[in-house]
UniProtKB/Swiss-Prot annotation:
Cited Pfam families: Frataxin_Cyay (PF01491)
Protein's name in the database: Frataxin, mitochondrial
Keywords linked to the UniProt accession: Heme biosynthesis, Ion transport, Iron, Iron storage, Iron transport, Mitochondrion, Oxidoreductase, Transit peptide, Transport
SMART domains cross-referenced by the UniProt entry: Frataxin_Cyay
TM segment ranges: none
GO annotation, cellular component aspect: mitochondrion
Organism from which the protein derives: Dictyostelium discoideum (Social amoeba)
Gene this chain is encoded by: fxn
EC number assigned by the record: 1.16.3.1
Catalytic activity: 4 Fe(2+) + O2 + 4 H(+) = 4 Fe(3+) + 2 H2O
PROSITE patterns, A to Z: FRATAXIN_1 (PS01344), FRATAXIN_2 (PS50810)
Length: 193
């Protein structure tokens, strides 16, 4: 990640911009002018496209700092992308196999009408009858698991290498815990993964 501090002094307020970017050495800079436009500058100082990035704007007034805005931040410091693609596939495939094993038990129990589990090519589809469909798939370029749920909507999960589990990259909820909870809500089946 690239870290860059920009300073701009005005009459009484000193503004600092702390910027994080993980996209090919691009740095997103807030043009602190009256227009407040965003521009993106690469290492050659040439204008390029704006990329989604983690932004923290901190304003200092009389030596007191106040956080104004924060967006799209990963809250868990243990989640770093798995660099080895083969290791990533092994970890995700093992997780999906566990899900399929546990969910097939639910399917065989016939406690949830219309319940089906399908898994192939890195995509796990869980059909919960007329209540909706889950799609859980691996995203190799991002080294993430992506989730689409009829209850909680879309989510992205990063691998926590310390806890050895997948966690939501926004709120830190473990993937297994979320799946257990939602299957329990939809199917009234107490599943433990």
């Amino acid at each position: 990640m690239i870290f860059n501090f920009l300073n701009k002094a005005s009459n009484k307020t000193h503004t600092k911009l702390l910027l994080f970017s993980s996209i090919r050495n691009r740095i997103l800079i807030n043009n602190i002018s009256s227009t407040s436009k965003w521009s993106s500058i690469n290492n050659n100082n040439k204008q390029s496209s704006v990329s989604k990035t983690n932004i923290f704007i901190i304003t200092t007034h009389n030596k007191q700092q106040q956080q104004l805005s924060k967006s799209f931040s990963t809250i868990n410091n243990n989640t770093k992308p798995i660099s080895d693609v083969n290791l990533f596939h092994d970890i995700v495939d093992e997780e999906f196999e566990l899900f399929v094993d546990r969910l097939e038990i639910l399917s065989e129990a016939n406690t949830c009408e219309g319940f089906e589990v399908e898994g192939n090519d890195g995509v796990l589809t869980i059909i919960v009858g007329n209540k909706g469909t889950y799609v859980i798939n691996k995203q190799t370029p991002n080294r993430q698991i992506w989730w689409s749920s009829p209850l909680s909507g879309p989510k992205r999960f990063d691998y926590d290498s310390v806890e050895k589990r997948w966690v939501d990259n926004r709120d830190g909820t473990p993937l297994r815990q979320l799946l257990n909870s939602e299957i329990n809500t939809l199917c009234k089946y107490d599943m433990e993964i």
